[in-house]
Amino acid sequence: HRWLNQLLASYRISHRKPNRKFKVPRAVLMQRLEIFWIVTAKLRTMVMLHFGYDPTFKNIDQSPFHQNEAGSKEWGTLALVGQHTVPLIENHAATRERWSLNTLTDSVEEQISDDNMPGFEIMFKAEGKQVEAKLQAYVLKKKILGMRVTVVTGPSGSYRENDILNFLEKHLPPWGPGRRWEIFLLDAYAPGLTDNVQRFGWLRGYLIFTHGGGASMVCQTNDTDLHQWTRKRFIDKQTALLLREARTMGGGLVEATREENIDLMIEVMQDPALHKQASKGYKYTGTNVALDGSEDWRICREAGDFWQE
């Protein structure tokens, strides 16, 4: 294909994959983003006029992981040049065994420190409650500083309405003296769109509002400024762990246990810089920029492109 490469080079044409695949037509996405920005601005204005302060934001979102995350992404491995086969040193079934990471982001960057970071929850796929009780006891024994970490199980490894309500109950502080109203964001995921979730948020002092369908990849801070870096760090740590275990075993297939994956995720998430970057995302996505337009310059990436249209 040398002639083809020379032809492409002469006309300055490159063969590339799209770096973003939207889930809805661009016109629909534009409309949903506009609705999101208008409604959040109106909610902020309402709270400011009635209570005299600008409400802060929180956002939860789940992201899928696997028992062997690097293998699930089909990352390359080392082999000798000219070798006809590539050795398999991982449990292939573990690359398909899914679990969910449910993260929480906070718009107040100044409050994030070594002693105060947004918590998270891991949901593994398991029937019954025996595995859940075992993993919860494991987490309770650990001395986790600066954040709340919980673990649950479910038949599908994905969140249902009841799971979301339980997560909110464990991770959102109750309403009381000194609390202020906050805006709580969810993506357009059916179990989170129920009246029960709305009522629970209201009782805890949160105005719950959802991103438009297909718009979370543009304006949800968990997607734009947290999960990508979390996944990269997790894969690095998990790969190093599997290599150490492979050397220790001297051969055979290696697989990270649920407990080891919990430990790795705690190591990743116990970095205030990771959460502060996610906090900056509220400005980058236009969620809580100044209402007078003085911070519009901070809106960037896809959100900035749509904001300027």
Language model segments and positions:
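Phosphate-facing sequence motifs and polybasic nucleic-acid/acidic-lipid-binding regions
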Residues: 1-308
